[in-house]
């Protein structure tokens, strides 16, 4: 794709809107998605909307970070410092980013059945995803694995003990839940469990056996990713849970 051509001058199979309709939004590059938001480029003889989208990403790459991670929290003032981006284009980009955040963070309806690690991560994303502080939360379920609610138990840092079994199961009992999924976030984005994560999970699985409140999983959430300790460890074989 030539970035200096107007989008109208491109072959139809290279135009972002037409490609989105024909192939789906996931097939577009980040620059093409931005181009759809921009609508127009810098003007005659200059960058097209796609070229301007790529130029924005290139400018943000100068900070030696993923451009998308910078876009997530960018301001109108920062965007309008980029040549070719005025207030109208900047506010359109920010509105799209905020809408994407809200869609991503939306919780499933109450009493939705949580049947997979992905469903659990979706339910907890508003509390734990993209957070700069480490948080520990519980997903409260009834006997049929229907979602009763979520609760952040503690907020701390990676060097602190985030949660004690007494706090976790105390909340489960207070809320009248029959089953529980625990979760915490890694602000670094790395969702591999640490030795401390493994040890805490062992303690909680043992406590769940004593209290007869099945602990179904421990989900670690990062920047758009998650991992299930039930899937990647043998802990549930060592500490089997009822049901």
Curated annotation (Swiss-Prot):
| One annotated GO biological process | proteolysis
Outline the extent of the MPN domain: 113-235
Presence of the UniProt keyword Repeat in the record: no
Q: Where is this motif: JAMM motif?
A: 184-197
Q: Which InterPro entries match?
A: MPN, RadC_JAB, UPF0758, UPF0758_CS, UPF0758_N
In which residues is Zn(2+) bound?
A: 184, 186, 197
- MF terms in GO: metal ion binding; metallopeptidase activity
Key words, A-Z: Hydrolase, Metal-binding, Metalloprotease, Protease, Zinc
Indicate yes or no for the key word Ribosomal protein: no
The family annotation for this protein states: Belongs to the UPF0758 family.
Annotated PANTHER family: DNA REPAIR PROTEIN RADC (PTHR30471), UPF0758 PROTEIN YEES-RELATED (PTHR30471:SF3)
The protein, known as: UPF0758 protein Tery_2667
Q: Which organism is it from?
A: Trichodesmium erythraeum (strain IMS101)
């Amino acid at each position: 794709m030539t970035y200096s051509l107007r989008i109208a001058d491109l072959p139809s199979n290279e135009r972002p809107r037409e490609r989105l309709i024909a192939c789906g939004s996931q097939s577009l590059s980040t620059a093409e998605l931005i181009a759809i938001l921009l609508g127009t480029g810098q003007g005659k003889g200059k960058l097209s909307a796609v070229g301007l989208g790529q130029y924005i990403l290139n400018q943000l790459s100068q900070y030696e970070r993923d451009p998308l991670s910078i876009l997530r929290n960018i301001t109108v003032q920062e965007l309008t410092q980029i040549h070719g981006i005025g207030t109208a284009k900047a506010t359109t980009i920010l509105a799209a980013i905020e809408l994407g955040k809200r869609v991503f963070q939306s919780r499933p309806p109450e009493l939705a059945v949580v049947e997979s690690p992905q469903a659990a991560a979706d339910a907890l994303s508003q509390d734990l995803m993209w957070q700069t502080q480490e948080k520990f939360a519980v997903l409260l379920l009834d006997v049929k694995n229907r979602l009763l609610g979520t609760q952040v138990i503690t907020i701390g840092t990676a060097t602190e003990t985030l949660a004690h079994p007494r706090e976790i199961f105390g909340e489960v009992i207070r809320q009248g839940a029959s089953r529980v999924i625990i979760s915490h976030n890694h602000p670094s984005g790395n969702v591999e469990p640490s030795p401390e994560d493994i040890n805490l999970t062992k303690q909680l699985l043992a406590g769940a056996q004593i209290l007869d409140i099945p602990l179904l999983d421990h989900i670690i959430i990062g920047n758009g990713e998650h991992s299930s300790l039930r899937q990647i460890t043998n802990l549930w074989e060592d500490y089997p849970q009822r049901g």
